[in-house]
């Protein structure tokens, strides 16, 4: 009967070689790290790195030798016995039908898989330290977007909404309008209102034109009338011991001071 795998002696020999290499690695590591001042000297770190690289190559060589021995035993396997004959036909057709570059890639994948199976504990530790769950990279990947503070460009602190005391905003607006000389009503809407009133109140409005100076004069007079009316209405509301201006105050002011309107 054909031999399909390594025998017991080879497995024991391989485990013995790996154990001897690990013992030498432990002994040499203790020898390097036991030197006084090892943590503060660059030479000690360099010796330790060189030592790890050396034993890494030794462990990889052990795995490569096992792979070569498995390849040498492969021709002695009788694959024509039983159901293996069909596998032989399928395998031969698959290899011949496959392009040459794919055949080389598959061989490389087999070598890579074998090397990764016999990888040393040193490489396994390094790979675990660099994944997304441990070390610096782990802390960086674990931080969520909600933990980050988004700063506004050009500012050194986070902007906060200003809160005003009751009545402070109104006083600031009153001072702004008192100091400015601009009109309160925009000119374009007021001009449209004047033209609309002219079209509805006069039958021959299509032939009439109004100058911009006349519109400005009407706007000045209208705003002066509104300011005077609201000033008198606020006095009436203050006389009634109320702080809120209502429509009854405006109507009373019109009856008393503006009887013609």
Swiss-Prot record:
Gene3D superfamilies: Histone, subunit A. The record marks 71-72 as: Cleavage. Induction: Present at much lower (<5%) level than hcp-3 (at protein level). Residues 113-127 have a biased composition (Polar residues). Residues 80-150 are annotated as: Disordered. Cleaved at the onset of meiotic anaphase I, likely by separase sep-1. The keyword Nucleus applies. It is found in: Nucleus; Chromosome. This is Histone H3-like centromeric protein cpar-1. It comes from Caenorhabditis elegans.
